[in-house]
Amino acid sequence: MNKHFILTTILILSSLLSQSQEDLSILKGKELHNKVRLNFIPVEMPSDKFPELKPTMGLTGLHYQIPINDWLYGGADFHFAVTGDQGGLFTLGAELGINKQLYKNLYFDANFHFGGGGGYRKYINDGGFINPNIGLQYKKNNYSFGVQYSHVNFLSGEIKSNSVSFFVEIPSILRFTDYDKAHQEFVANNISPDSFWSKPVVKNAQQIRFDFFKPIGKSKKDNGSPLTETLSVIGFEYQKYLNNNTFLFAHTDAIYKGLRAGFMDLFVGAGYIPFQSKYINVFGKLGIGAAGGRIAPEGGLTIYPSAGIDLKLSDKLALSGHGGYYKAIDGDFEAYTVGFGLKYFGLNGGTSSEEKKHTNFYTQGIRIEIQNQSYFDVAKFDPPTTRYTTDLQLIGLKANYDLNKWLYIAGEAGFAYDGGSGGYAHGLVGGGIYSPRFLNNKVRGFIEFMAGAGGGAGVDTDEGIIVRPTLGLNYDITNSVSIIASGGRYYSPFGNVNSNNINIGLSFNLSTLSVKN
């Protein structure tokens, strides 16, 4: 009797399990042909009014552009100073653009950016800026370059410039499905070569990083005194693999100990894995980008070669350790670095890799949010003795990864555009819990906790550690777009910031196909 009961139970569970996996051929997919654009804008500085300034700042932009239709695109972008004496100037913005064919490979391209950020407050004030561009683009085989007439305007500040800028653009393909297909499992035993998903998988990795910079040489603080303190920074890195050994990456860091909050960096680059086994990867990387804030005024352009080892905890998780050398190209700041992090690997968007064809898959829910963030009565401190409060407005970019139907993890960057605090920025990581859906499945609540590093522009976070608990609601306009509203508290445990916070924005929702190991 017991044997029959056990056998029956096993058969029922096996049946339920098999029913939970659907055939991959029924999953409808979509493909977006996105673009990654890198541009350079020479910005005329107000050196007549401020003789201490160099006459020109070189501003580089990194843009991720998504087609809305065959002539209209939108996206998000970072700008950062690389030449001149404004190292540490960073901005985050949103953009809308037009791209129309004129003749054969020649295209008209125009766009408009709005964002927030900055560096030295007396030159940019609130931090809000606009950057319209208009010009020509030459395309061939999905790659392109172009020239534009550009206007850079920090609206309440002193930096206002017209110039000729240049850009290059490379393709980036995103294959995905609808957000309501998230958290489902699929099997592909005999998938047709003509199937939408019969493509190579894209390997990627995401990493939370902790780095420690030991300054050497002539490194100086912004007051001219020698910089000898070890700088502790927290950061995030994204890696996209070109093949099993070579990858591209982007990463950013913000300081939380060693100096008053305000130092940050942003790098892009490439890496190579000369040795890998079941348990470890040995890698080398070269990053080039920008860094600055709370150090002596420099151009910003910085290189960061490094090498390290990944210790694999599973097929998807690894502990990563690294060491490197950090050097300003147009300045004196340099440091030896050591660091560690937790790395998550994924295989997305297809069914085959260099090693094998995969058969078991799941769909991963992702939400990308653009927000307006309001912070009220934020404590500020301007040395030596001036203390006061102000209301801040930030533009925020946030990515949420659903672990299941109820839990998610998130990462966020935010930059000030109003409140006399241009140059304030934060980077946060954390997670949250969803409520059940209600009101015809259109509304879902959430509770969230985020923590990280933030500072600059006199915002009194001390060395930079901040936390932000919030409660909020999502309302689905469509399956792909939601309105987000939330409120909570913004608190610095070692500084004097303790403020109410309200966030309103849009969420763009999708699901990606991932290999289930």
Q: Across the structure, where does each feature detected by a protein language model lie?
A:
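Transmembrane beta-strands of outer-membrane beta-barrel pores
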Residues: F40-P46, F78-G84, I98, F114-Y120, ...
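Bacterial Sec-dependent N-terminal signal peptides
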Residues: M1-S25
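Transmembrane beta-strands of outer-membrane beta-barrel proteins
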Residues: N34-L38, L72-A76, F108-F112, F145-V147, ...
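Residues on the lipid-exposed face of transmembrane beta-strands in outer-membrane beta-barrel proteins
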Residues: L62-I66, A94-K100, I134-Y138, F166-I170, ...
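Residues that define the transmembrane beta-barrel architecture of outer-membrane proteins
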Residues: K54-T60, Q86-L92, D126-P132, K160-V164, ...
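Surface-exposed strand-loop-strand hairpins of Gram-negative outer-membrane beta-barrel proteins
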Residues: P42-G61, A76-D77, F213-E237, F376-G396
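Repeated loop/turn-to-beta-strand initiation elements of outer-membrane beta-barrel proteins
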Residues: D70-A76, K104-F108, Y138-V147, L174-Y179, ...
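Outer-membrane beta-barrel "beta-signal"
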Residues: F40, K160-S192, R209-P215, A335-K357, ...
